[in-house]
């Protein structure tokens, strides 16, 4: 998936083309756009919209230089999803301005509200959408480095040229594993989705008990709690948490400036480990609040 993002941008962008990148989001989009000669334009997503991209936000960011929108849903780090009704509104703006979409759907099998809908399936969108996906998240095959891209032949053919000269091909062993996953892995994916959903609900329950503000994510395997009440930056909070409780979480700012005041919490761990992590998190937060009461 990661290489496909790079190849797609190299194939599609001319120097100076603007790439719209909603944030918080995966860290590779901005550098890939720059390496391809593009100009990244960040759209800051808002917690009050559950970190979804709205048609109004998209419309406001488009200029005559806009070539491509990156659509990173289900989202890393927020866990946000785009429902079909959201995508339909986005699609109308895309068609109106005649731009392309790079839809990163690597977490498409991990949704907990409704089945994932790809924007490429909407009327008039297939010919202007590159869909990126892979096996790392859906089938827990992160180390196999196997992904794929779907889209209009004219773009895929150019991506293939870049791919051939960059790494030649994915390892044959990974490709055989991918075929096996597609043929016989559906039951495993469903079981994993159910397990993740239980962990997701557990984390949300614990954060509520701690009194932390946290919107409910319905995709991927991340929760994005707000820690702004403590008067610390996300990086300061994460660093102190690591030093005092030996618990490592990722500052929201790792995924864009608008991630300030948030932390990314992954639940791609056993429930036993998550319980221990939440106990340490609660102890840390309790200490901060007691410290604040003394200073007040």
Give the label of every model feature segment.
Residues 2-296:
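PLP-dependent class I/II
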């Amino acid at each position: 998936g990661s290489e496909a993002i790079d190849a797609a941008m190299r194939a599609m962008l001319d120097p100076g083309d603007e790439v719209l990148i909603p944030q918080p989001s995966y860290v590779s989009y901005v550098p890939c756009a720059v390496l391809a000669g593009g100009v990244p334009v960040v759209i800051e997503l808002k917690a009050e919209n559950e970190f979804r991209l709205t048609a109004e936000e998209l419309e406001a960011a488009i200029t005559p230089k806009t070539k491509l929108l990156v659509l990173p849903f289900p989202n890393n780090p927020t866990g946000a999803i785009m429902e079909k009704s959201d995508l339909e509104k986005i699609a109308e703006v895309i068609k109106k301005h005649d731009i392309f979409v790079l839809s990163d759907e690597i977490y498409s099998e991990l949704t907990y509200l409704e089945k994932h809908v790809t924007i490429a399936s909407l009327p008039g969108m297939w010919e202007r959408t590159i869909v990126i996906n892979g096996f790392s998240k859906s089938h827990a095959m992160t180390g196999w480095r196997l992904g794929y891209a779907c889209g209009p032949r004219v773009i895929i053919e150019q991506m293939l040229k870049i791919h051939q000269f960059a790494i030649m091909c994915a390892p044959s062993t990974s490709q055989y594993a991918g075929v096996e996953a597609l043929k016989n892995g559906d039951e495993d994916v469903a079981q994993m989705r159910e397990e993740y959903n239980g962990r997701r609900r557990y984390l949300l329950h614990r954060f509520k008990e701690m009194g932390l503000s946290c919107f409910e994510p319905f995709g991927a395997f991340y929760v994005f709690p707000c820690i702004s009440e403590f008067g610390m930056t996300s990086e300061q909070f994460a660093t102190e948490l690591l030093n005092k409780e030996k618990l490592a979480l990722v500052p929201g700012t790792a995924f864009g400036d608008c991630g300030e005041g948030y932390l990314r919490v992954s639940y791609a761990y056993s429930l036993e480990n998550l319980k221990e992590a939440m106990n340490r998190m609660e102890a840390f937060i309790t200490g901060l609040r007691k410290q604040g009461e003394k200073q007040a």
